[in-house]
Amino acid sequence: MASSKNMPSRITQKSMEPPLRETWQQVVQEMVMRKQRDEEEKQNLVTGKEKSWVSIDLLGTKQEGKRQKVNIWGPWEKWGIKIVWVMLWVIQLMLWGCLIWEMGKKHSCNAEEVIALVDDPGGFQKVKYVESVPVTCMTKNFTQWGCQPEGAYPDPDLEYRNISQDILEQVYKQEWPWNTYHWPLWQMENMRQWMKENEKEYTSRNNKTKEDIDALLAGKIRGRFCVPYPFALLKCEEWCWYPANINQETGHAQQIKINCTKAKAVSCTEQMPLAAVQRVYWEKEDEEGMKFMNIQACNESQLRCKTSPGGCVQGYPIPVGAEIIPESMKYLRGKKSPYGGIKDKNGELKLPLSVRVWVRMANLSGWVNGTPPYWSARIKGSTGINGTRWYGIGTLHHLGYNISSNPEKGLCNFTKELWIGGDRFQYQYKPSWNCSQNWTGYPVWHVFRYLDMTEHMTSRCVQRPLRHNITVGNGTITGNCSVTDWEGCNCTRSGNYLYNSTTGGLLVIICRQNSTITGIMGTNTNWTTMWGIYKNCSECKNSTLDRTDNGTLGTVNNINCSLPHYNESNKWTCAARNSKKKRDSLYIAGRDFWGRVKALYSCESNLGGLDGMMHQQMVLQKYQVIKVRAYTYGVVDMPKAYREKNMRNKRSTEISRPRKKRGIGLVIVLAIMAIIAAAGAGLGVANAVQQSYTRTAVQSLANATAAQQNVLEATYAMVQHVAKGVRILEARVARVEAIVDRMMLYHELDCWHYQHYCVTSTRTEVAQYVNWTRYKDNCTWQQWEEEIEQHEANLSLLLKEAALQVQIAQRDAQRIPDVWKALQEAFDWSGWFSWLKYIPWIVVCIVGVICFRLLMCVITMCLQAYRQVREIRYTRVTVVIEAPVDLEEKQREERDGSSGSENLEHEKRTSPRSFIQIWRATVQAWKTSPWGKGWKKILYMTLLPLLTLQIWMEETGWNGDKRCKKKKERVDCQDRESMPAIENEYVELS
């Protein structure tokens, strides 16, 4: 029973009763829940957490679960998530935009613009002073002539480089200049020296002597002139001429410029004779080169001469001011010019040319029997025709022979002379060529001068009109006429007419063939001024300049009242000078309207007359010396990482030294100065450049390819330009060498290679005086030179700024501050110690006063001793000549009226002492005096000879009897009792 009571009852509550029937799904769910509770309990035991809290509601039901806490930040978290989400989208859009913007840029890497030297195959620099360019010749006979063998330089016909027309125009600006090349002058000097050295040997020769020298004299030895790298020759292949600087008063062209439109760069010239004497006919191999010198007028210039009957002038214009033989080789000039029209105003070659000279290959098609056209129609004995004066018509000098100007005659006469420049040498030789041959077809030089220099208006030379043949047209001239516009002017009758210009001056219009205007001369002087001068001429008040029908061209009524001019005394006159029934022929010139002109022709011409030197000089004018530049300046983008890496690697190899970090202001100024100096950089290599050429660069140069050599050459040139800038600063700033050393030591000027560029550390933003960005990616050397020329005016400003930067850099670079200078700047001590400059004068004055006092002391002591010794002498003399008894008796006798014969006898008994006696007495007196003792003894001993001499002279009477008498009277009148007692007076009396 008891056991049965203790057992639980099977009867439970309805809720606790198991379901009668459970589904499978309920069973699985219950098992899962139990499993989860077990795992949760295990996890709590492991982590040490307490068991979930238990709550009992009012019905007594247990509720297990976690406590639900209230979150007060819930709303904020909800909106914060949204804000963060929006910000992330904004950042994402910004990143996408930056990415798209960077992709749109040319360079996506982080870089900075730096100045660099880039490859420029067509770059070159013109050389203004060709005297400094090295040159050599190349020929087959190189051993005899001292030249290089053929093949030493590239053949210009096979190896050359074309130059674009844009670069030509940019560099030379449509002006191909004249150059006086020194190479032909050297050849001429060698020939002249060789002839002078062998001048004595030539006297033994005859005309049968034949040797190889005739080939040299005749110009058979041909060769080329070549220049070494980096120099080259720019050969013009197409050119034309055009006028420039037209004078608005006279109408003449002050300059004729040459425009080269096609050229190529070569190393050597064409074949030409290396040396030759004066000749007329040249070889047919030279015809092509001579014909090229017949330059025609440019088509774009629209010159008036193109529509004139004679056309425009053809030839090469040697400009006004050209110097044929420079001053350094003046010994080659000679007395007179041997080249015909190529001469100065005095007919020599000492001065530059005063008139433009044209040289061309002669066109002899219209010549008849060796004379120019219409030569037979000239006035008999005249040397000119159609306004041109001809020289050398008839006979010409050709290689030592007088040859006819008619090439078909073949007349030759040997002159036994060779003309080389202005010198003539006697020489006998038998040429291997035939002088008497038919020279038709051989090229000849034609030299002519247009004295009025109006080639752009007409090519016809006119005979200048006489002044009395200039008249007023009176309706003959119509239209608008001026010296620069001939097209609007018309004439109806041949003559020389005075006409008003449309510009306000006066014109002389030359009309021929009743309708053709062949020349117009002008001046700014108007009609009113001219007429006032005309009326002031004597006998011309009632005269006019109207035309009379005397002559074909007409003349004035009174020939003594012609157009005014300046006479030989530089005074106005209207009449020509008369002398012995002869009258001066006065003409009017285009460039000298009021002058006294006596030249009839406006042109001068001659055939031949040129030697090998002038032939080479003319042919070489188609060449210009240039300096090849295989690089140019540009702006490139250098990655900063690459730059920093190279700088770090390079500096790690050097010895690190502690220094104060400074700015790059000095480097900037030096770089700018180097840039400014680049256009005029010298041809030599500076020592600084050689030192900066490191061992690594030399090894790289030895192993480099062609492209790398260009890069290294650019590097070399950049450093050379910097060195040139340093040399410029050296002349203006002190101690630049130390600054350059500091630059090199601190690597403030570096150069490295990046994508075939030589890049410096100078950034573009610091180059304030050069617009680098203008030439980015397409900068050429020519553009660089043009940019440099525009900034040369800032050179003084740059030098001042450079000097300031140098001073600042020197101040910052000092390790120990200069305390003295700092104090001097803080306190102006300049006026405090200004009196110190007088200290030397004060010292000199003090020393001078001391010396003067010492001298006066010595002199005073000497004078005092002299007086005392002299007083002793007088005392002794007084005792010697004293006779007390006799004096009293004599006085008494004289009072009694005696004649004084006793006195005379007594005077006869006393005789003057000798010099030795006086010397002894003086020495004895000196010994007994205080001056003969102590340190003064030697000093005053020097006075004894002088004192003895003076006493002896007084004794002998040389100083006069008057003094002796006075002494005697003074002694005789003395009282005996007043005289002192002397110890040795009896010694003297005996």
From Swiss-Prot:
Residue intervals passing through the bilayer: 839-859
What's an example GO cellular component term for this entry? membrane
Key words, A-Z: Cleavage on pair of basic residues, Coiled coil, Disulfide bond, Glycoprotein, Host cell membrane, Host membrane, Host-virus interaction, Lipoprotein, Membrane, Palmitate, Signal, Transmembrane, Transmembrane helix, Viral attachment to host cell, Viral envelope protein, Virion, Virus entry into host cell
Residues exposed to the Extracellular side = 108-838
Which stretches of sequence are listed as region Immunosuppression?
Answer: 729-745
Record: glycosylation sites: 141, 162, 207, 259, 299, 363, 386, 402, 413, 434, 438, 469, 474, 480, 490, 500, 514, 526, 536, 542, 550, 560, 567, 703, 771, 778, 794
Q: Where is the lipid attached (S-palmitoyl cysteine)?
A: 862
**Residue numbers for the site described as Cleavage?**
662-663
Show the segment(s) annotated as Disordered. Answer: 890-909
**Superkingdom as given in the UniProt entry:** Viruses
Q: Which residues form a coiled coil?
A: 695-745, 786-821
Its signal peptide is 1-107
| Cytoplasmic membrane side | 860-990
Q: Describe its PTM?
A: Specific enzymatic cleavages in vivo yield mature proteins. Envelope glycoproteins are synthesized as an inactive precursor that is N-glycosylated and processed likely by host cell furin or by a furin-like protease in the Golgi to yield the mature SU and TM proteins. The cleavage site between SU and TM requires the minimal sequence [KR]-X-[KR]-R. The transmembrane protein is palmitoylated.
Keyword rRNA-binding included in the entry's annotation: no
* Spans annotated as Fusion peptide: 663-683
- Gene Ontology biological process terms, A to Z: symbiont entry into host cell; virion attachment to host cell
Is Disulfide bond found in the keyword set?
yes
The task this protein performs is described as: The surface protein (SU) attaches the virus to the host cell by binding to its receptor. This interaction triggers the refolding of the transmembrane protein (TM) and is thought to activate its fusogenic potential by unmasking its fusion peptide. Fusion occurs at the host cell plasma membrane.
Record text on subunit structure and interactions: The mature envelope protein (Env) consists of a trimer of SU-TM heterodimers attached by noncovalent interactions or by a labile interchain disulfide bond.
UniProt-recorded name of the protein: Envelope glycoprotein gp160
**GN (gene name):** env
